[in-house]
């Protein structure tokens, strides 16, 4: 595994779904994933999830690569080279989202949108012009999120990008979780100190990072983190 662009490879506890193929891709729209909660009675997070055998009770580890889309060629290489069980998170700042998403779905990858959120040190880490900020009104936060969600399709949810200030603010996060609940999406918190994954917040299934795999990019260091993720999954049963 390698770091792609400025993205982070990390492991989270996995979910479950019935075995089968990925659902056909939905078309993009103003409000993002379409169809969502009304689609065949299943929310988008289930409709577009990568399926696995729920009767297989072995512990699971979910791996997500974030920050894709900022460099077209590197992103296509990630889609082609990563196993289809790896979830890919794409930046809304990409200028090649449509072909990247189409190829990712064709290769069987589950898709997340990496939503930029205000960091604790914005002068050192720039989340970009579309970032969600604690200074925004609830309406502005909803509008920004809806605009970003409208850029992608066939995704199961979002993962926070930076956001160690925004995501800690329950008032700021409230409209985000409400929008995700309405669209049948899940939320992945990209911070190690958050509660265990698998919880429900404002009606939204949430997961949090258990281990970062690329703190040290040396192959042997990444291998150690992978083994640590395996050990954690065996210890916790997920």
Residues of each region from the PLM?
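Terminal interaction modules at protein C-ends
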Residues: 1-57
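Hydrophobic faces of well-ordered beta-strands that scaffold small-molecule active sites
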Residues: 61-65, 84-90, 109-115, 156-160, ...
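Anion (oxyanion) recognition and catalysis
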Residues: 102-105, 181, 200, 234
């Amino acid at each position: 595994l390698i770091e792609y662009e400025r993205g982070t490879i990390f492991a989270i506890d996995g979910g479950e779904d019935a075995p089968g193929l990925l659902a056909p891709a939905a078309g993009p729209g103003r409000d993002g994933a379409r169809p969502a909660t009304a689609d065949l009675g299943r929310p988008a997070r289930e409709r577009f999830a990568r399926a696995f055998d729920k009767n297989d009770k072995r512990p699971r580890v979910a791996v997500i690569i974030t920050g894709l889309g900022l460099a077209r060629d590197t992103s296509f290489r990630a889609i082609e080279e990563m196993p289809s069980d790896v979830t890919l998170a794409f930046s809304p700042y990409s200028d090649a989202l449509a072909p990247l998403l189409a190829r990712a779905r064709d290769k069987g990858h589950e898709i997340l949108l990496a939503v930029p959120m205000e960091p604790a040190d914005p002068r050192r880490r720039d989340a970009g012009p579309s970032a969600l900020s604690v200074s925004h009104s609830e309406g502005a936060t909803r509008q920004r999120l809806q605009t970003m969600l409208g850029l992608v399709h066939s995704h199961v949810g979002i993962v926070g990008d930076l956001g160690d200030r925004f995501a800690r603010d329950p008032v700021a996060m409230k409209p985000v979780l409400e929008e995700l609940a309405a669209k049948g999406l899940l939320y992945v918190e990209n911070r190690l100190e958050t509660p265990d994954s698998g919880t429900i917040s404002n009606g939204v299934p949430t997961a949090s990072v258990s281990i970062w795999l690329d703190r040290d990019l040396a192959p042997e260091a990444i291998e150690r983190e992978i083994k640590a993720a395996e050990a954690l999954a065996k210890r916790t049963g997920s």
